């Protein structure tokens, strides 16, 4: 059983019924829909198709809606693009929209001229093009082309080390979030989160439109977000290490260190952490990854990531199925060599909260699983809380969450090591233990004579009160 969760971005290469069904069978735990592209009508079709397929495949595949966020972009060019040479003068216009050419273009952030200073850098298209600001003339930013190339319509614009005043949630984002509530998606990925207040703004919109159960994944893509990561983790459900824009906004040599630090902080807080962007990037064009990409996926798992994500590889690449299968194979091999004791040791709190019974029980369960032959930990849960806390401590054996609610199953889709099954509501300890034995055999994780652990909270009518751990022989 694979423990590391996989998120596949759905796009032109993968939005057919055939590919989506194969993704689910390979082990797609969440389907990511990028709302920087497409309209509500096209996304509705995809969501309805995914919902139908996951029902047919009896899968708990979650749907993750990724909002565009306060991204600065270029506007249109004549013929869709223009060629720029090193040393050319080029103007970014913050005034009225103009049609771009090889001397100028408009950008979506109309106040950038107020924020940027001569000597500053502007990067376009994930840093492929670089400009140095010479002067600011009214609403025009006059630059020298440092690294030329082809500049195109609607490409991302980054301004490293310049705090921007764009709102955390744009009007388009608000509309997309409300649409997500209407479509009952499971997760929202909020782009360019810079401070905890940004997360709370997204939360307020979701809560006020029937989306209280939707979990928020905060995408960290700037130095400001990195600087505020501790406070962001406190208010978010999970974090995505979004290395694309991060690697443009922040010196590239810092990105691996930041990735490791964010993963560790999320692990310690028991929050979901996703490693994303360019994990198998060469598989957009080739049927096999580079050795460095295979190492990247493996090392993210060794660091403690809960989930790994494909972007262009699955959305627009030539080999979406091969990329998905390759990612799964690398994950399984990494897990077979994972040092679970190391991950557990670095989570131990030297000053534990004496009231944190659930944490104490979950830590003990993971510790016991590493020393005592245990095939699975079965967690009976109404809210997902018991299973999530067990996942925090990354036991060496699988966690089987049994719950009466499909929505809870999907809320656990991105937590490391959890598989889930819907079952009837439990009224007693005996019922839970009997069901635990049954599902462990059903998933072919345990056989007669094997040991499992059962974790639950009593009385069962109270949610979030994990207070029991029992070893049972099947």
From Swiss-Prot:
K(+) binds at residues 34, 36, 66. Mg(2+) binds at residues 221, 245. Pfam families: PK (PF00224), PK_C (PF02887). The record marks 219 as: Transition state stabilizer. The keyword ATP-binding applies. Substrate binds at residues 32, 244-245, 277. It catalyses: pyruvate + ATP = phosphoenolpyruvate + ADP + H(+). The keyword Magnesium applies. Its cofactor is Mg(2+); K(+). One of its GO terms (molecular function) is pyruvate kinase activity. Keywords: ATP-binding, Glycolysis, Kinase, Magnesium, Metal-binding, Nucleotide-binding, Potassium, Pyruvate, Transferase. Pathway: Carbohydrate degradation; glycolysis; pyruvate from D-glyceraldehyde 3-phosphate: step 5/5. It comes from the Bacteria. Belongs to the pyruvate kinase family. PANTHER family: PYRUVATE KINASE. This is Pyruvate kinase. It comes from Clostridium perfringens (strain 13 / Type A).
């Amino acid at each position: 059983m694979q423990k590391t969760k996989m998120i596949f971005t759905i796009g032109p290469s993968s939005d057919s019924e055939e590919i989506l069904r194969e993704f689910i069978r390979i082990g797609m735990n969440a389907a990511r829909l990028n709302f920087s592209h497409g309209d509500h009508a096209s996304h509705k079709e995809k969501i309805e198709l995914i919902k139908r397929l996951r029902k047919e495949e009896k899968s708990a595949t979650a749907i993750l809606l990724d909002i565009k966020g306060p991204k600065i972009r270029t506007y249109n060019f004549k013929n869709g693009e223009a060629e720029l040479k090193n040393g050319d003068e080029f103007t970014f216009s913050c005034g009225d929209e103009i049609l771009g050419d090889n001397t100028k273009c408009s950008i979506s952030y109309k106040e950038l001229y107020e924020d940027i200073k001569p000597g500053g850098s502007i990067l376009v298209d994930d840093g492929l093009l670089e400009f140095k600001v010479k002067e600011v003339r009214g609403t025009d930013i006059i630059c020298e082309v440092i690294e030329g190339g082809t500049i195109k319509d609607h490409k991302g614009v980054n301004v490293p080390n310049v705090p921007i005043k764009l709102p955390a949630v744009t009007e388009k984002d608000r509309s997309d979030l409300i649409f997500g509530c209407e479509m009952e998606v499971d997760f929202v990925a909020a782009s360019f989160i810079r401070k905890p207040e940004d997360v709370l703004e997204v939360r307020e919109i979701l809560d006020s439109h029937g989306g209280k159960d939707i979990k928020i994944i905060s995408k960290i893509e700037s130095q400001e977000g990195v600087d505020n990561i501790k406070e962001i983790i406190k208010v978010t459900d999970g974090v995505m290490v979004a290395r694309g824009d991060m690697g443009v906004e922040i010196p590239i040599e810092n990105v691996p260190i930041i990735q490791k630090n964010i993963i560790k902080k999320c692990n310690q807080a028991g929050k979901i952490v996703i490693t994303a962007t360019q994990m198998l990037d060469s598989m957009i064009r080739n049927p096999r990854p580079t050795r460095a990409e295979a190492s990247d996926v493996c090392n993210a798992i060794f660091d403690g990531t809960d989930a790994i994500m494909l972007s262009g590889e699955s959305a627009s690449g030539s080999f979406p199925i091969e990329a998905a299968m390759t990612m799964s194979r690398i994950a399984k091999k990494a897990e077979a060599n994972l040092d679970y004791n190391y991950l557990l040791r670095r989570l131990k709190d030297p000053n534990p909260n004496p009231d944190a019974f659930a944490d104490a029980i979950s830590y003990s369960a993971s510790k016991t699983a590493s020393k005592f032959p245990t095939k699975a930990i079965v967690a009976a849960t109404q809210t997902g809380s018991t299973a999530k806390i067990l996942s925090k401590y990354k036991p060496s054996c699988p966690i089987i969450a049994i719950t009466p609610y499909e929505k809870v199953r999907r809320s656990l889709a991105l937590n490391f090591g959890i598989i889930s099954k819907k079952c009837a509501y439990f009224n007693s300890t005996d019922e839970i233990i009997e069901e635990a034995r049954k599902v462990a055999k059903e998933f072919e994780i345990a056989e007669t004579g094997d040991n499992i652990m059962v974790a639950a909270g009593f009385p069962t009518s109270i949610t979030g009160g994990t207070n029991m751990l029992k070893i049972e022989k099947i």
